[in-house]
């Protein structure tokens, strides 16, 4: 289960050259990377789902934004029916992390939220970054097209001991090369990530840390 959750955190794909990968596949992947790293700033809505058979183990909505070195990610997750929220960000000077975990029962007292803030010169990589880099871990990639998407299938992992899925399926929009969907099976569970919306053109102020956004939280500066 730990390996499965690590892969979900890693989840999203990535695209660098591999000698055994067809040039048409590499071209689509490289264009996808360029489209998803808009220098004017890009924000994408993503839905993550992890299930075992017909049982939903985890669902997660992520609103992830980036512009150069600036970043922000707002995550709402539901694990076995329990909802939790978090937000991380870097505004060029400070990085912060806010987590909200609900009480597990009516008898449990409400927990006080905390925002941890510290000075930083550059942002740390977050679990929700679109890391666009997994193709090097696979020996084979095939591609087909339908009316709206390029559908790329990665298979035959290079290193089995890393517990990578045997097959990863990636959908990329034909019209603009935005990533649409990533799906796989891992340790008996089905994992999917779907990008539901992409917005470009973000002001720097959008990434600035503002304590007023967390009125009920304790701000702790490290």
Predicted region positions:
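Short, cysteine-centered beta-strand-loop-beta hairpins and adjacent loop/turn segments enriched
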Residues: 51-57, 79-82, 158-164
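A short, surface-exposed beta-strand/turn
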Residues: 61-68, 89-93, 166-181
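N-terminal leader/targeting segments and the immediate start of mature chains
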Residues: 17-69, 142, 212-222
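Sec-dependent N-terminal signal peptides
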Residues: 4-15
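An acidic-aromatic
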Residues: 63-125, 189-192
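A short, amphipathic edge element
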Residues: 24-27, 129-142, 193
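Gly/Pro-enriched, hydrophobic low-complexity segments
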Residues: 49, 139, 143-221
């Amino acid at each position: 289960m730990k390996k499965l959750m690590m892969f979900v955190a890693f989840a999203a794909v990535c695209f660098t050259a591999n000698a055994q990968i067809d040039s048409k596949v590499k071209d689509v992947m490289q264009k996808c990377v360029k489209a998803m790293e808009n220098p004017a700033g890009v924000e994408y809505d993503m839905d993550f789902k992890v299930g075992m058979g017909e049982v939903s183990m985890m669902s997660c909505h992520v609103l992830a934004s980036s512009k150069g070195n600036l970043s922000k990610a707002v995550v709402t997750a539901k694990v076995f029916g329990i909802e939790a929220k978090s937000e991380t960000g870097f505004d060029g000077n400070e990085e912060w992390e806010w987590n909200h975990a609900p009480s597990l029962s009516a008898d449990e007292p409400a927990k006080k939220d905390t925002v941890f803030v510290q000075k930083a010169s550059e942002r740390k990589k977050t679990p929700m970054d679109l890391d666009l880099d997994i193709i090097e871990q696979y020996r084979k990639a095939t591609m087909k097209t339908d009316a709206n998407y390029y559908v790329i299938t990665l298979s035959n992992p290079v290193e089995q001991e890393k517990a990578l899925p045997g097959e990863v399926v990636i959908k990329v929009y034909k019209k603009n090369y935005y990533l649409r969907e990533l799906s796989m099976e891992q340790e008996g569970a089905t994992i999917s990530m779907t990008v539901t919306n992409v917005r470009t053109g973000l002001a720097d102020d959008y990434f600035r840390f503002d304590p007023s956004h967390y009125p009920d939280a304790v701000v702790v500066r490290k």
